[in-house]
């Protein structure tokens, strides 16, 4: 298990098994759980990432990343899920501080949270 996972970091994770239209397989994910939860829990909260940007209809819960990965990709905040940290395979990189602020908005949209 990888230690010291932090919010905003990108990892390769094993999202198998999966069913239907849910993103699965070995793929990049963005850690969205807060750092306290990451420190003390054996699970973390992630958003899967896809590089199939031309086959996905762009919706308000999507966030495009054009750095840190091999190719331009989309973070799918409508598919946020909890995974065991044992499913995290390797570190890829980290979002910059500007993008970290933007993902809060995408998470709020996905969960139906109104701005306070």
Q: Where would I find each of the regions flagged by the language model?
A:
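Conserved functional hotspots at enzyme active or ligand-binding sites that engage polyanionic ligands
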Residues: 1-116
């Amino acid at each position: 298990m990888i230690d010291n996972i932090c919010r905003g970091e990108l990892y390769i994770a094993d999202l198998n098994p999966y069913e239907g239209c849910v993103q699965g397989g070995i793929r990049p994910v963005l850690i969205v759980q807060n750092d306290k939860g990451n420190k003390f829990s054996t699970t973390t909260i992630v958003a899967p990432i896809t590089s199939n940007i031309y086959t996905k209809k762009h919706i308000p819960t999507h966030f495009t990343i054009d750095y840190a990965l091999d190719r331009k990709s989309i973070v799918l905040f409508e598919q946020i899920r909890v995974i065991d940290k044992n499913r995290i395979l390797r570190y890829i990189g980290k979002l910059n501080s500007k993008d970290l602020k933007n993902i809060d908005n995408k998470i709020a949209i996905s969960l139906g949270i109104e701005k306070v």
